[in-house]
Amino acid sequence: MVNMAAPATEHVRNIVLVGQDGAGKTSLAEAMLHVSGRTPRMGTTHDGKSYLDYDQEEIRRKFTLGTSVAPIPYHDYKINLLDTSGHPDFIGDTLATMQAAEMALFVVDAVAGPQVMTTKLWREAEGMRLSRAVFINHIDREHANFDTIMAQLHARFGSRLGPVTIPIGVAEDFKGVIDVLRMKARYFDQDGTTDDRIEDIPAEYAEAAQIARDRLCDLVAEADDDLMMKYLDGSEQLTQEELESLLDKAIAQELFIPVYVGSTIIEQGIRCVMKDICTYFPHPRHHGAFRLANGEETFVDEDGEPAAFVFKTVADPFVGRLSYLKLISGVLTPSMELINARTGKKDRLGHLYVMMGKEATDVKSAKAGDIIVVPKLTDTRAGDTLSQSGTMSIDPLPLPVPQYPVAIEAANKKEEDKVGTFLTRAVENDPTLRVARNEQTHQTIVTAMGEAQVETLLARMKEQAKVEARLVPVRIPYRETITKTAEAQGRHKKQTGGAGQFGDCWLRISPNPGEGYEFSDEVKGGAIPGGLIPAVDKGVQEAMAEGFLAGYPMVDIKCAVFDGSYHSVDSNEMAFKTAARIGFRAACEQAGAILLEPMATMDIVVTEEYAGTVMGDIATRRGRIVGTDSTDEGETVIMVRVPYAEVISYPKDLRAMTRGSGSYYIELEGYDPAPADVTKKLVEAYQASKA
């Protein structure tokens, strides 16, 4: 049995399970755990008894929300399974985890086939130069069709995919697989816990098996130039020994992408995958170069200085803060000091854990290539690099930018600080969350990937921080301005028996497009003492902050005070501030005040079949198409300019229009005059709120 604490680098296999939500990634991991003897039963998500989906929200929703690690000792190897979410709202966590693996095993449903997230994550894996394999799951289900799914995989991902197992029967007739690599039939027992029964290939499957075998040899031969030439000119066939000796190289070089088939629920077809993971899937030293921030590269090296890359952090309610590390070089031991390249601070490692779901096991050391978990690294975040010298800094993968803004407030105003503290911690744990305070609208804005991520955030806040928060409508940061020059007097006089108040000023306001607020003193002959002029300026700015039409701050205005009068006893700063506010509002009555709405530019990426629908939808949102382009993958890029208020909920709307395949990037870009109907609606709402 392999040493789970510190296996040799070449005996580690880091496999990330990826694919569409519901394809069976977690059930594949649970089946591997059970078949290997790691767990006494197969955990299942649907009944809340999964070893890996243990979070309360995962149990409630019945799907994976974040990465869980499942280390499996199998023969002389340690397989680190990284079970990830297939939900688009949690793609950031999935992408970060993919950096820690040498192999991405895509799980595809035998009925639904490759779906939107399958395609998105496949492209990401290609960009990372991550080796890939496919497991076609649920082949025992009604309407399952192996040939159809293989055709879809070839059409979407190319011709380098090839089956290494072929089902013997489908749906209720599924009873085994053809092992194309070894050209044998493997029949299963009832529960998958004993070795498969090996027999000769049935005659009716001989032709399909030979076609798959020939294709396998064609692709694998490319891994050796000399053998390829002999093979292609027909002078030699690959021997079994040559095929098996080249297969790991072909997979690591992405020349061949193996496809397996089975059913996780009945634990069939699992042993073939696990055996090949150990024998042919790449080990950590096969990983390509890690790009460093200084432009150099580094590789997994057991003899190098101790260094690790943090791919995930979580706040565990029982253990505290946990950091998930992929060891890049050297050996880690408890009490070792490492320096965070981002902060320059030293962190002393306490315990080293091997995690299995939520269960932590202490280990005494960990070697390069392995995955380990360290508690209580207080200022460490996902994407950080820790090393003994502090000079190594691995470039983290750029993660998707969140585009879904919501406003959050505490259900009890007295608990606003608790909400803020929890949100700060949540952002540290999830790099696809953003939290900011909008000083104009006085709202806390959380920007996320989508609704499910926000709902999960609120549920965890209630569970972990014991505080409830609620969503409220996002206030759009409208502004107001003027379009004409106008003059008006502001006069304030108040007499109450003692010292009174008197202020009198004449103001001229005019548009100042794009230049902000400017104030000037044009008073002649001491009509207003110089010491009171700043009070006029303050009064104007206070009036602008309150707005004129609908309570939104006013911008881009020049204001000059050019005349007035004062009283030697009753004039003071307060009186002239009040007079200035009166005068400013009076001038606005004549200055053509208008409402400004924030505008956004968007690059929307969709497949051609949805381009027309999306363009039509943008028109209904008062948007304007400013151009189109295409991606290397043949998708359409639609460039638009649209009022920001019209696209607040765009993530879920685009997902609905494109069946989850569309994506976009948005930036705020200036302000435009709001149309009359929008202005009327906002003015009426403002007046009603004051009534």
Locate each region found by the language model:
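Structural and coupling elements of P-loop NTPases
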Residues: 1-691
